[in-house]
Amino acid sequence: MNLNFNPLETNLVNLAIVIGVLFWFLRGFLGGILERRRSAILQDLQDAEARLKTASEELTKAQSELAAAQQKAEQIRIDGQKRAAAIRAEGEKRTISVMAAIKQGAAADADAEASRIKDALRREAAMAAIDKVLTDLPGRLDDAAQSRLIDSTIRNLENA
């Protein structure tokens, strides 16, 4: 195999001219396309950075609002617990007060009933004693002594 070193016969000159012309024409065409693509990519990056910044600001704002809402919810829960405790304590105080009033009423009723029973027993004992004396005395006393005893007993009964 022989190598041909004649530049005109091997089309090296033609190839160099065609490549140079293509390079010169395509440089402007491809350079414009690449420049437009570069500008579009830079614009997309700037838009993405702006959206990221906006999203970050909104996230920070939402987090602060969430923290405030959580604090408010905690305060409401604490206030509710305090209110429930106060209501429970008030209910207990009222229950104790009502129970004390019922106990005092029952004690007063028991005291009144005991007093009434004591008075009734005293009267019955007095009446029984008087009846016994009245049955025994006529045989023991004369009419004058019997009359004095009856008057004395009547006065004692009136004072009792």
Swiss-Prot record:
Subcellular compartments: Cellular thylakoid membrane
Pfam families, sorted: ATP-synt_B (PF00430)
Topology term for the membrane: Single-pass membrane protein
Signal peptide feature range: none
Ribosomal protein listed as a keyword: no
Ranges that cross the membrane: 15-35
Chief location of this protein within or outside the cell: membrane
GO molecular function per UniProt: proton-transporting ATP synthase activity, rotational mechanism
Disulfides per UniProt: none
Keyword vocabulary terms for this entry: ATP synthesis, CF(0), Hydrogen ion transport, Ion transport, Membrane, Thylakoid, Transmembrane, Transmembrane helix, Transport
Cross-referenced CDD domains: ATP-synt_Fo_b
GO CC aspect terms: plasma membrane-derived thylakoid membrane; proton-transporting ATP synthase complex
Subunit structure and binding partners: F-type ATPases have 2 components, F(1) - the catalytic core - and F(0) - the membrane proton channel. F(1) has five subunits: alpha(3), beta(3), gamma(1), delta(1), epsilon(1). F(0) has four main subunits: a(1), b(1), b'(1) and c(10-14). The alpha and beta chains form an alternating ring which encloses part of the gamma chain. F(1) is attached to F(0) by a central stalk formed by the gamma and epsilon chains, while a peripheral stalk is formed by the delta, b and b' chains.
Family statement drawn from the similarity comment of this UniProt entry: Belongs to the ATPase B chain family.
Its biological purpose: F(1)F(0) ATP synthase produces ATP from ADP in the presence of a proton or sodium gradient. F-type ATPases consist of two structural domains, F(1) containing the extramembraneous catalytic core and F(0) containing the membrane proton channel, linked together by a central stalk and a peripheral stalk. During catalysis, ATP synthesis in the catalytic domain of F(1) is coupled via a rotary mechanism of the central stalk subunits to proton translocation. Component of the F(0) channel, it forms part of the peripheral stalk, linking F(1) to F(0).
Database matches in HAMAP family: ATP_synth_b_bprime
NCBIfam families, alphabetized: PRK07352.1
Protein name per the record: ATP synthase subunit b
Species whose genome carries this gene: Synechococcus sp. (strain CC9902)
Taxonomic lineage: Bacteria, Bacillati, Cyanobacteriota, Cyanophyceae, Synechococcales
Gene: atpF
